[in-house]
Amino acid sequence: MYNLRDAAGETQQDVADGLNRLGVARGKRLAVTANQVSRWERGITYPSALYRQLLAEHFGVSVQDLGLTRQRVTPQQRDSPENDSGGFAIYQDPASHPQAEDSQEEWRAVRRKLNIHRVQLAREAARLYDVEQRVGDSGLIAASQWLLSTPIELARFGIGLAPEGTAPLVTGTEDAAAGVRPLASDGRRHQRYSLALRDVEQPRLFENRLAWHLAGVDWSQPDRALTFTTGTYFGGVDVSEALAHEMAMYHVAGDGSGILPASWRNLGFRRLVGDPFTPSRRPTAPSTDTLTLRVDDDGASFVLHNRAAGNVAVAGGMLHIMPAGVFQPSSVLPAAQVADFDLWRNMMREYSEEFLGSAEHGGDGEPADYSAEPLGAFDRALASGGVRVFCLGVALDALTLWGEILTVAVFDGPTYDHLFADMVDSNAEGTVVKTGRVRPTSALPFTRHTIDELTASGRLAPAAAGCLELAWENRRTILGRS
Protein backbone atom coordinates (compact mmCIF):
# COMPACT_ATOMS: atom_id res chain seq x y z
CA MET A 1 0.00 0.00 0.00
CA TYR A 2 2.89 2.35 0.76
CA ASN A 3 4.34 1.68 -2.70
CA LEU A 4 0.99 2.46 -4.35
CA ARG A 5 0.75 5.75 -2.48
CA ASP A 6 4.37 6.62 -3.25
CA ALA A 7 3.86 5.86 -6.95
CA ALA A 8 0.81 8.14 -6.97
CA GLY A 9 2.81 10.93 -5.33
CA GLU A 10 0.26 11.26 -2.54
CA THR A 11 0.56 11.97 1.16
CA GLN A 12 -1.29 9.94 3.76
CA GLN A 13 -3.66 12.90 4.15
CA ASP A 14 -4.35 12.81 0.40
CA VAL A 15 -5.37 9.17 0.68
CA ALA A 16 -7.55 9.88 3.73
CA ASP A 17 -9.30 12.74 1.91
CA GLY A 18 -9.82 10.55 -1.15
CA LEU A 19 -11.45 7.79 0.89
CA ASN A 20 -13.74 10.26 2.62
CA ARG A 21 -14.88 11.60 -0.78
CA LEU A 22 -15.53 8.07 -2.02
CA GLY A 23 -17.53 7.42 1.12
CA VAL A 24 -19.72 10.45 0.45
CA ALA A 25 -20.30 9.19 -3.10
CA ARG A 26 -21.59 5.95 -1.58
CA GLY A 27 -23.83 7.77 0.87
CA LYS A 28 -21.58 7.04 3.86
CA ARG A 29 -20.12 9.69 6.12
CA LEU A 30 -16.57 8.60 6.98
CA ALA A 31 -13.79 10.25 8.93
CA VAL A 32 -10.57 8.58 7.78
CA THR A 33 -7.44 10.36 9.00
CA ALA A 34 -3.80 10.38 7.92
CA ASN A 35 -2.95 8.61 11.18
CA GLN A 36 -5.35 5.83 10.27
CA VAL A 37 -3.73 5.42 6.84
CA SER A 38 -0.32 5.33 8.50
CA ARG A 39 -1.43 2.54 10.84
CA TRP A 40 -2.75 0.51 7.88
CA GLU A 41 0.55 0.91 6.04
CA ARG A 42 2.55 -0.20 9.07
CA GLY A 43 0.31 -3.19 9.69
CA ILE A 44 -0.70 -1.96 13.14
CA THR A 45 -4.38 -2.19 12.23
CA TYR A 46 -6.16 -3.93 9.38
CA PRO A 47 -8.75 -1.97 7.35
CA SER A 48 -12.33 -3.20 7.26
CA ALA A 49 -13.88 -4.65 4.12
CA LEU A 50 -15.38 -1.25 3.24
CA TYR A 51 -12.06 0.55 3.60
CA ARG A 52 -10.25 -2.14 1.59
CA GLN A 53 -12.75 -1.66 -1.23
CA LEU A 54 -12.36 2.12 -1.10
CA LEU A 55 -8.56 1.86 -1.05
CA ALA A 56 -8.64 -0.41 -4.10
CA GLU A 57 -10.95 2.03 -5.89
CA HIS A 58 -8.79 5.00 -4.91
CA PHE A 59 -5.59 3.44 -6.27
CA GLY A 60 -7.30 1.71 -9.22
CA VAL A 61 -6.15 -1.78 -8.25
CA SER A 62 -7.70 -4.97 -6.89
CA VAL A 63 -8.01 -5.54 -3.14
CA GLN A 64 -5.35 -8.25 -3.41
CA ASP A 65 -2.94 -5.77 -5.01
CA LEU A 66 -3.09 -3.53 -1.94
CA GLY A 67 -0.62 -5.86 -0.26
CA LEU A 68 -2.38 -5.70 3.09
CA THR A 69 -1.73 -8.52 5.53
CA ARG A 70 -2.90 -9.26 9.03
CA GLN A 71 -0.22 -9.33 11.69
CA ARG A 72 1.21 -12.77 12.36
CA VAL A 73 2.97 -13.83 15.52
CA THR A 74 6.72 -13.88 14.96
CA PRO A 75 9.40 -15.48 17.13
CA GLN A 76 10.22 -12.07 18.56
CA GLN A 77 6.57 -11.44 19.46
CA ARG A 78 6.27 -14.81 21.16
CA ASP A 79 9.31 -14.10 23.31
CA SER A 80 8.52 -10.49 24.17
CA PRO A 81 8.08 -9.44 27.82
CA GLU A 82 4.78 -7.83 26.79
CA ASN A 83 3.28 -11.26 26.25
CA ASP A 84 4.80 -12.82 29.38
CA SER A 85 5.64 -15.96 27.42
CA GLY A 86 8.95 -17.73 27.71
CA GLY A 87 10.89 -19.80 25.20
CA PHE A 88 11.76 -19.26 21.58
CA ALA A 89 9.48 -20.85 18.98
CA ILE A 90 10.21 -20.80 15.25
CA TYR A 91 7.07 -20.09 13.25
CA GLN A 92 5.74 -23.00 11.26
CA ASP A 93 2.69 -23.23 9.07
CA PRO A 94 -0.13 -25.10 10.85
CA ALA A 95 -0.16 -27.61 7.98
CA SER A 96 3.26 -28.80 9.14
CA HIS A 97 1.66 -30.07 12.34
CA PRO A 98 -1.69 -31.76 11.56
CA GLN A 99 -2.73 -31.91 15.21
CA ALA A 100 -2.27 -28.15 15.50
CA GLU A 101 -4.33 -27.59 12.38
CA ASP A 102 -7.20 -29.70 13.76
CA SER A 103 -6.95 -28.05 17.16
CA GLN A 104 -7.08 -24.56 15.69
CA GLU A 105 -10.03 -25.36 13.43
CA GLU A 106 -11.96 -26.77 16.39
CA TRP A 107 -11.07 -23.65 18.37
CA ARG A 108 -12.33 -21.41 15.55
CA ALA A 109 -15.59 -23.36 15.45
CA VAL A 110 -16.16 -22.72 19.15
CA ARG A 111 -15.33 -19.02 18.66
CA ARG A 112 -17.95 -18.82 15.92
CA LYS A 113 -20.57 -20.40 18.21
CA LEU A 114 -19.49 -18.07 21.00
CA ASN A 115 -19.94 -14.93 18.91
CA ILE A 116 -23.32 -16.10 17.59
CA HIS A 117 -24.65 -16.91 21.06
CA ARG A 118 -22.91 -14.38 23.33
CA VAL A 119 -26.11 -12.84 24.65
CA GLN A 120 -27.80 -16.17 25.35
CA LEU A 121 -24.63 -17.57 26.92
CA ALA A 122 -24.32 -14.53 29.19
CA ARG A 123 -27.89 -14.93 30.39
CA GLU A 124 -27.29 -18.62 31.03
CA ALA A 125 -23.97 -17.93 32.78
CA ALA A 126 -25.79 -15.56 35.13
CA ARG A 127 -27.80 -18.55 36.35
CA LEU A 128 -24.60 -20.00 37.77
CA TYR A 129 -24.72 -17.27 40.42
CA ASP A 130 -27.24 -16.38 43.14
CA VAL A 131 -30.46 -14.83 41.92
CA GLU A 132 -29.81 -11.79 44.13
CA GLN A 133 -26.64 -11.13 42.14
CA ARG A 134 -28.31 -11.13 38.73
CA VAL A 135 -29.22 -7.81 37.12
CA GLY A 136 -32.63 -8.85 35.80
CA ASP A 137 -32.32 -10.94 32.65
CA SER A 138 -29.58 -8.75 31.17
CA GLY A 139 -26.74 -11.25 31.56
CA LEU A 140 -25.01 -8.99 34.08
CA ILE A 141 -24.24 -9.85 37.69
CA ALA A 142 -23.40 -7.44 40.49
CA ALA A 143 -22.39 -7.74 44.11
CA SER A 144 -24.51 -6.22 46.83
CA GLN A 145 -23.96 -2.45 46.86
CA TRP A 146 -22.15 -2.39 43.50
CA LEU A 147 -25.22 -0.85 41.85
CA LEU A 148 -26.38 2.53 43.09
CA SER A 149 -29.90 2.89 44.45
CA THR A 150 -29.93 6.40 42.95
CA PRO A 151 -27.65 7.42 40.06
CA ILE A 152 -25.00 9.99 40.95
CA GLU A 153 -23.19 12.44 38.71
CA LEU A 154 -19.60 11.64 37.81
CA ALA A 155 -18.32 14.76 39.56
CA ARG A 156 -19.68 13.53 42.90
CA PHE A 157 -17.28 10.62 43.36
CA GLY A 158 -13.61 9.93 42.85
CA ILE A 159 -11.46 7.04 41.72
CA GLY A 160 -8.05 5.97 42.92
CA LEU A 161 -5.18 3.56 42.44
CA ALA A 162 -5.03 0.65 44.85
CA PRO A 163 -1.73 0.05 46.65
CA GLU A 164 0.58 -2.21 44.72
CA GLY A 165 0.08 -5.68 46.14
CA THR A 166 0.50 -9.24 45.07
CA ALA A 167 0.01 -10.24 41.45
CA PRO A 168 -3.37 -11.70 40.45
CA LEU A 169 -3.75 -15.32 41.54
CA VAL A 170 -5.51 -16.37 38.33
CA THR A 171 -4.13 -15.24 34.95
CA GLY A 172 -5.49 -17.71 32.39
CA THR A 173 -2.19 -19.56 32.04
CA GLU A 174 -3.22 -22.31 34.47
CA ASP A 175 -3.79 -25.94 33.52
CA ALA A 176 -7.49 -25.43 34.23
CA ALA A 177 -7.62 -23.11 31.20
CA ALA A 178 -5.51 -25.28 28.90
CA GLY A 179 -8.56 -26.78 27.20
CA VAL A 180 -9.65 -23.42 25.79
CA ARG A 181 -6.25 -22.68 24.24
CA PRO A 182 -5.48 -24.40 20.91
CA LEU A 183 -2.22 -25.97 19.90
CA ALA A 184 0.28 -23.58 18.37
CA SER A 185 1.98 -24.22 15.05
CA ASP A 186 4.88 -25.98 16.77
CA GLY A 187 2.53 -28.47 18.41
CA ARG A 188 2.71 -26.88 21.84
CA ARG A 189 -0.36 -25.33 23.43
CA HIS A 190 -0.71 -21.55 23.30
CA GLN A 191 0.27 -20.16 26.68
CA ARG A 192 -2.34 -17.40 26.72
CA TYR A 193 -5.74 -16.90 25.13
CA SER A 194 -4.69 -13.52 23.73
CA LEU A 195 -1.79 -15.16 21.88
CA ALA A 196 -4.16 -17.74 20.41
CA LEU A 197 -6.46 -14.96 19.21
CA ARG A 198 -3.61 -13.06 17.61
CA ASP A 199 -2.07 -16.17 16.05
CA VAL A 200 -5.17 -18.05 14.90
CA GLU A 201 -7.98 -15.54 14.38
CA GLN A 202 -6.92 -11.99 15.06
CA PRO A 203 -9.69 -9.38 15.25
CA ARG A 204 -9.01 -6.26 13.21
CA LEU A 205 -8.64 -4.15 16.36
CA PHE A 206 -6.42 -6.12 18.69
CA GLU A 207 -3.45 -4.45 20.34
CA ASN A 208 -1.94 -5.00 23.75
CA ARG A 209 -2.05 -1.69 25.58
CA LEU A 210 -1.88 -0.48 29.12
CA ALA A 211 -5.24 -0.75 30.84
CA TRP A 212 -6.55 -0.18 34.33
CA HIS A 213 -7.94 -3.23 36.10
CA LEU A 214 -10.77 -3.01 38.60
CA ALA A 215 -9.59 -3.62 42.18
CA GLY A 216 -12.56 -2.61 44.32
CA VAL A 217 -15.99 -0.95 44.49
CA ASP A 218 -17.07 0.92 47.63
CA TRP A 219 -19.66 3.65 47.21
CA SER A 220 -19.46 4.48 50.93
CA GLN A 221 -16.05 6.04 50.16
CA PRO A 222 -16.97 8.86 47.74
CA ASP A 223 -13.37 10.05 47.35
CA ARG A 224 -12.24 6.59 46.19
CA ALA A 225 -15.44 4.79 45.25
CA LEU A 226 -13.67 2.80 42.53
CA THR A 227 -10.08 1.62 42.81
CA PHE A 228 -7.86 0.22 40.08
CA THR A 229 -4.49 -1.33 39.43
CA THR A 230 -2.37 -0.92 36.31
CA GLY A 231 -2.28 -3.85 33.91
CA THR A 232 -2.72 -4.64 30.23
CA TYR A 233 -5.63 -5.21 27.89
CA PHE A 234 -4.38 -8.68 26.96
CA GLY A 235 -4.21 -9.56 30.65
CA GLY A 236 -7.96 -9.01 30.87
CA VAL A 237 -8.63 -10.90 27.64
CA ASP A 238 -6.62 -13.91 28.83
CA VAL A 239 -9.17 -14.50 31.58
CA SER A 240 -12.41 -13.08 30.19
CA GLU A 241 -12.38 -14.71 26.76
CA ALA A 242 -11.10 -17.98 28.22
CA LEU A 243 -14.15 -18.03 30.52
CA ALA A 244 -16.44 -17.29 27.57
CA HIS A 245 -14.81 -19.96 25.41
CA GLU A 246 -15.17 -22.56 28.16
CA MET A 247 -18.86 -21.72 28.56
CA ALA A 248 -19.43 -22.02 24.80
CA MET A 249 -17.62 -25.37 24.63
CA TYR A 250 -20.04 -26.99 27.06
CA HIS A 251 -23.25 -24.97 26.78
CA VAL A 252 -23.84 -24.60 23.03
CA ALA A 253 -25.61 -27.60 21.52
CA GLY A 254 -23.41 -29.75 19.29
CA ASP A 255 -25.14 -28.55 16.14
CA GLY A 256 -24.95 -24.95 17.34
CA SER A 257 -28.73 -24.64 17.40
CA GLY A 258 -29.26 -23.62 21.00
CA ILE A 259 -28.02 -23.21 24.56
CA LEU A 260 -27.90 -25.97 27.15
CA PRO A 261 -28.96 -25.34 30.78
CA ALA A 262 -26.29 -23.77 32.97
CA SER A 263 -24.16 -26.21 34.93
CA TRP A 264 -20.85 -25.97 36.76
CA ARG A 265 -19.89 -29.33 35.36
CA ASN A 266 -16.79 -29.06 33.12
CA LEU A 267 -16.28 -25.38 34.03
CA GLY A 268 -12.94 -25.99 35.72
CA PHE A 269 -11.46 -22.61 34.87
CA ARG A 270 -14.53 -20.71 36.11
CA ARG A 271 -14.34 -22.67 39.37
CA LEU A 272 -10.67 -21.73 39.67
CA VAL A 273 -11.54 -18.04 39.22
CA GLY A 274 -13.76 -18.34 42.29
CA ASP A 275 -15.69 -15.39 43.69
CA PRO A 276 -16.27 -13.06 40.73
CA PHE A 277 -16.70 -10.10 43.09
CA THR A 278 -13.12 -10.26 44.30
CA PRO A 279 -11.82 -8.53 41.16
CA SER A 280 -8.22 -8.31 42.35
CA ARG A 281 -8.00 -12.13 42.30
CA ARG A 282 -7.75 -11.95 38.50
CA PRO A 283 -6.97 -9.22 35.93
CA THR A 284 -10.45 -7.64 35.75
CA ALA A 285 -10.40 -5.18 32.87
CA PRO A 286 -13.39 -2.80 32.88
CA SER A 287 -15.08 -0.75 30.18
CA THR A 288 -16.99 2.49 30.45
CA ASP A 289 -20.41 1.77 28.91
CA THR A 290 -22.36 4.94 28.19
CA LEU A 291 -26.02 5.24 27.27
CA THR A 292 -26.19 8.48 25.28
CA LEU A 293 -29.56 10.24 25.56
CA ARG A 294 -30.64 13.22 23.45
CA VAL A 295 -33.42 15.06 25.27
CA ASP A 296 -35.81 17.76 24.06
CA ASP A 297 -39.46 18.70 24.59
CA ASP A 298 -40.58 15.70 22.52
CA GLY A 299 -38.82 13.16 24.74
CA ALA A 300 -35.54 11.26 24.80
CA SER A 301 -33.76 9.11 22.23
CA PHE A 302 -30.59 7.02 22.15
CA VAL A 303 -28.25 5.33 19.68
CA LEU A 304 -26.94 1.78 19.37
CA HIS A 305 -23.78 0.31 17.90
CA ASN A 306 -23.71 -2.93 15.89
CA ARG A 307 -20.29 -4.28 16.89
CA ALA A 308 -18.65 -6.38 14.18
CA ALA A 309 -17.42 -9.72 15.54
CA GLY A 310 -14.48 -9.72 13.11
CA ASN A 311 -13.30 -6.32 14.31
CA VAL A 312 -13.31 -6.65 18.09
CA ALA A 313 -12.29 -9.30 20.59
CA VAL A 314 -14.90 -8.45 23.24
CA ALA A 315 -18.68 -8.03 22.79
CA GLY A 316 -18.54 -8.78 19.06
CA GLY A 317 -21.70 -9.56 17.12
CA MET A 318 -23.94 -7.69 19.55
CA LEU A 319 -25.88 -4.44 19.73
CA HIS A 320 -24.29 -2.13 22.28
CA ILE A 321 -24.88 1.31 23.67
CA MET A 322 -22.35 3.84 22.50
CA PRO A 323 -19.79 4.88 23.24
CA ALA A 324 -18.15 2.01 25.10
CA GLY A 325 -14.48 1.40 25.57
CA VAL A 326 -11.82 -0.15 27.76
CA PHE A 327 -10.66 2.12 30.59
CA GLN A 328 -7.09 2.79 29.51
CA PRO A 329 -4.66 5.66 28.92
CA SER A 330 -4.28 7.25 25.51
CA SER A 331 -0.52 6.71 25.46
CA VAL A 332 2.22 4.67 27.10
CA LEU A 333 3.93 7.92 28.11
CA PRO A 334 3.88 8.53 31.88
CA ALA A 335 2.05 11.85 31.52
CA ALA A 336 -0.95 10.09 29.99
CA GLN A 337 -1.17 7.61 32.84
CA VAL A 338 -1.81 10.55 35.15
CA ALA A 339 -3.94 12.79 32.92
CA ASP A 340 -6.10 9.98 31.52
CA PHE A 341 -6.98 8.37 34.86
CA ASP A 342 -10.43 9.91 34.63
CA LEU A 343 -13.71 8.27 33.59
CA TRP A 344 -15.05 11.34 31.77
CA ARG A 345 -11.87 11.69 29.72
CA ASN A 346 -12.11 8.03 28.74
CA MET A 347 -15.69 8.64 27.64
CA MET A 348 -14.74 11.78 25.69
CA ARG A 349 -12.15 9.89 23.67
CA GLU A 350 -14.71 7.18 22.92
CA TYR A 351 -17.23 9.82 21.75
CA SER A 352 -14.58 11.24 19.44
CA GLU A 353 -13.80 7.80 17.99
CA GLU A 354 -17.23 6.16 17.81
CA PHE A 355 -19.49 9.13 17.05
CA LEU A 356 -17.13 11.29 14.98
CA GLY A 357 -14.86 8.64 13.47
CA SER A 358 -11.66 10.12 14.85
CA ALA A 359 -8.59 7.90 14.86
CA GLU A 360 -8.16 5.93 18.04
CA HIS A 361 -5.43 6.97 20.42
CA GLY A 362 -3.58 3.72 19.89
CA GLY A 363 -1.24 4.05 22.83
CA ASP A 364 1.86 4.35 20.64
CA GLY A 365 1.74 8.11 20.12
CA GLU A 366 1.37 11.36 22.01
CA PRO A 367 -1.18 11.63 24.85
CA ALA A 368 -4.62 13.02 24.04
CA ASP A 369 -4.87 16.81 24.06
CA TYR A 370 -8.08 17.60 25.93
CA SER A 371 -7.95 21.28 25.01
CA ALA A 372 -8.06 20.47 21.27
CA GLU A 373 -11.28 19.80 19.37
CA PRO A 374 -13.46 17.85 19.60
CA LEU A 375 -12.42 16.92 23.15
CA GLY A 376 -12.41 20.53 24.28
CA ALA A 377 -16.00 20.95 23.08
CA PHE A 378 -17.13 18.00 25.20
CA ASP A 379 -15.51 19.53 28.28
CA ARG A 380 -17.20 22.88 27.62
CA ALA A 381 -20.57 21.17 27.19
CA LEU A 382 -20.16 19.46 30.55
CA ALA A 383 -19.12 22.69 32.27
CA SER A 384 -22.06 24.62 30.79
CA GLY A 385 -24.66 21.99 31.69
CA GLY A 386 -25.36 21.01 28.10
CA VAL A 387 -24.58 17.45 29.12
CA ARG A 388 -24.95 15.73 32.49
CA VAL A 389 -23.22 12.41 33.15
CA PHE A 390 -24.49 9.89 35.69
CA CYS A 391 -23.09 6.63 37.01
CA LEU A 392 -25.52 3.77 37.65
CA GLY A 393 -22.95 1.50 39.29
CA VAL A 394 -20.63 -1.33 38.36
CA ALA A 395 -21.47 -4.85 37.19
CA LEU A 396 -19.82 -7.84 35.53
CA ASP A 397 -20.71 -9.56 32.29
CA ALA A 398 -21.66 -13.01 33.60
CA LEU A 399 -20.13 -14.77 30.60
CA THR A 400 -16.71 -13.11 30.68
CA LEU A 401 -16.62 -11.51 34.16
CA TRP A 402 -15.46 -8.36 32.34
CA GLY A 403 -16.04 -5.19 34.36
CA GLU A 404 -18.79 -2.82 33.21
CA ILE A 405 -18.90 0.75 34.54
CA LEU A 406 -22.47 1.73 33.66
CA THR A 407 -23.03 5.40 32.83
CA VAL A 408 -25.62 7.66 31.20
CA ALA A 409 -24.84 10.93 29.40
CA VAL A 410 -27.87 13.21 28.98
CA PHE A 411 -27.45 15.86 26.26
CA ASP A 412 -29.92 18.64 25.61
CA GLY A 413 -31.05 18.71 21.98
CA PRO A 414 -29.06 21.75 20.77
CA THR A 415 -25.85 20.57 22.45
CA TYR A 416 -26.16 17.07 20.99
CA ASP A 417 -26.92 18.41 17.51
CA HIS A 418 -23.93 20.75 17.64
CA LEU A 419 -21.42 18.22 18.95
CA PHE A 420 -22.53 15.40 16.68
CA ALA A 421 -23.46 17.28 13.51
CA ASP A 422 -20.86 15.19 11.66
CA MET A 423 -21.72 11.86 13.26
CA VAL A 424 -20.46 8.95 11.14
CA ASP A 425 -22.47 5.93 10.01
CA SER A 426 -19.65 3.49 10.69
CA ASN A 427 -16.42 3.36 12.62
CA ALA A 428 -13.56 0.98 13.23
CA GLU A 429 -15.64 -1.24 15.54
CA GLY A 430 -18.90 -1.50 13.60
CA THR A 431 -21.89 0.49 12.35
CA VAL A 432 -24.49 2.75 13.89
CA VAL A 433 -27.92 1.11 14.04
CA LYS A 434 -30.62 2.80 11.96
CA THR A 435 -34.36 2.15 11.77
CA GLY A 436 -37.08 3.28 9.37
CA ARG A 437 -37.34 2.50 5.67
CA VAL A 438 -38.59 5.85 4.40
CA ARG A 439 -36.39 8.08 6.54
CA PRO A 440 -33.71 5.99 8.26
CA THR A 441 -32.69 7.41 11.62
CA SER A 442 -30.24 6.43 14.32
CA ALA A 443 -32.45 8.01 17.02
CA LEU A 444 -34.25 5.24 18.91
CA PRO A 445 -37.03 6.39 21.27
CA PHE A 446 -36.17 5.92 24.93
CA THR A 447 -39.39 4.14 25.84
CA ARG A 448 -40.43 0.99 27.65
CA HIS A 449 -41.63 -0.50 24.36
CA THR A 450 -38.28 0.06 22.61
CA ILE A 451 -36.29 -1.42 25.49
CA ASP A 452 -38.55 -4.49 25.62
CA GLU A 453 -38.26 -5.04 21.86
CA LEU A 454 -34.48 -4.79 21.94
CA THR A 455 -34.23 -7.15 24.90
CA ALA A 456 -36.48 -9.68 23.16
CA SER A 457 -34.31 -9.55 20.03
CA GLY A 458 -31.58 -11.50 21.80
CA ARG A 459 -28.85 -9.27 20.36
CA LEU A 460 -28.52 -6.63 23.06
CA ALA A 461 -25.16 -6.81 24.86
CA PRO A 462 -25.52 -7.50 28.59
CA ALA A 463 -24.02 -4.12 29.51
CA ALA A 464 -26.42 -2.40 27.12
CA ALA A 465 -29.44 -4.31 28.43
CA GLY A 466 -28.51 -3.63 32.03
CA CYS A 467 -27.76 0.04 31.43
CA LEU A 468 -31.02 0.62 29.55
CA GLU A 469 -33.07 -1.13 32.23
CA LEU A 470 -31.42 0.71 35.12
CA ALA A 471 -31.67 4.03 33.28
CA TRP A 472 -35.38 3.45 32.66
CA GLU A 473 -35.96 2.60 36.34
CA ASN A 474 -34.18 5.84 37.30
CA ARG A 475 -35.46 8.00 34.44
CA ARG A 476 -36.94 10.65 36.74
CA THR A 477 -33.54 11.29 38.31
CA ILE A 478 -31.66 11.12 35.03
CA LEU A 479 -34.04 13.22 32.94
CA GLY A 480 -35.00 15.56 35.76
CA ARG A 481 -38.69 15.02 35.09
CA SER A 482 -41.57 14.00 37.30
Feature map (PLM): residue ranges:
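Short amphipathic recognition helices of helix-turn-helix/homeodomain-type DNA-binding modules
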Residues: M1-L4, D17-G18, L30-F88
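Short acidic alpha-helical/loop segments enriched in Asp/Glu that coordinate divalent cations
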Residues: S358-A372, H418-D422
